[in-house]
């Protein structure tokens, strides 16, 4: 028996490049739980986001797998001011220290 560990793919979230501003993120998470048959007893059902951590393997030879949710809590991306310009095609670097990719829960 092999466990299947799941987290958002680039398009699973429901809107390309969306983060915490996605107004349907809670519905997307419920659908994710349904499609992947996440058990009601799973900790991910009791909190927002689909991140998780699992210990796998026999005693003394275990490994930890950590899967991050980089969409549910992520601050909005900074849109380009010059569409298509080299290095500025869609988004710009954003050094705003108040922005987050993981949110407080995962950090």
Predicted regions span which residues?
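Metal-dependent phosphoester/phosphodiester hydrolase catalytic core
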Residues: 1-107
């Amino acid at each position: 028996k092999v466990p299947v560990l799941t987290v958002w793919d680039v398009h699973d979230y429901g809107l390309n490049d969306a983060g915490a501003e996605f107004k349907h993120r809670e519905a997307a998470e419920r659908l994710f739980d349904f499609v992947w048959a996440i058990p009601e007893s799973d900790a991910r059902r009791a909190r927002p986001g689909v991140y998780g951590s699992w210990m796998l393997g026999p005693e003394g030879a275990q490994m930890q797998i950590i899967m991050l949710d980089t969409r549910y809590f992520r601050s909005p991306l900074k849109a380009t001011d010059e569409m298509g310009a080299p290095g500025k095609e869609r988004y710009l670097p954003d050094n705003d220290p108040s922005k987050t990719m993981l949110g407080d829960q995962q950090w």
